[in-house]
Amino acid sequence: MARYDELEEKDRQLIDRAKEMTRTSYAPYSQFFVGAAIRMDNDSIIAGSNQENAAYPSGTCAERTACYQASALLPGMPMRKIAVAAATKPGFQRRPISPCGACRQALLEYEKLHGPMEVLLYGEEEIYIFPSVASLLPYCFTDF
């Protein structure tokens, strides 16, 4: 765990981008706005937000939006770090939220292809830091 002001500048930038992306979230049903930002191997940042749909569960989580966009825009390039932030109408969550199982598995597939992807989960009071996606999903699908 860490506080925002204890992080390196590059990690603060990644979290800031994830926080910015909550504003692009389309969440009229849940009112839960999530942003994700991925730092690529070339230091660029690719980001996404959750996009809901009335035909639930046809929406897409922020983490998958970001990783699929990263893979489409920079195919084959390793994803080194992901930051996730969530907000409701009053503001950002005090405690970090974690990716759902589907997002963990999707991120893990890219991690298996290109090596560890560090995970930063933002909360106003604290930030959880994980060395890899695999550390969030100990009993994952491994045969792919």
Name each region found by the language model:
Residues M1-T24, Y68, M77-F144:
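C-terminal binding/interaction regions
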Residues Y26-P28:
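Short Gly/Pro-enriched turn/cap motifs at secondary-structure boundaries
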Residues Q31-M40:
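Short beta-strand scaffold segments in enzyme catalytic cores
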Residues A37, N50, P57, C61, ...:
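Gly/Ser/Thr-rich beta-alpha loop segments that engage phosphate groups in nucleotides
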Residues S49-Y56, K89-Q93:
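A short glycine/serine-rich beta->alpha loop
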Residues N53-A72:
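A short mixed-secondary-structure module that forms the rim of ligand-binding clefts
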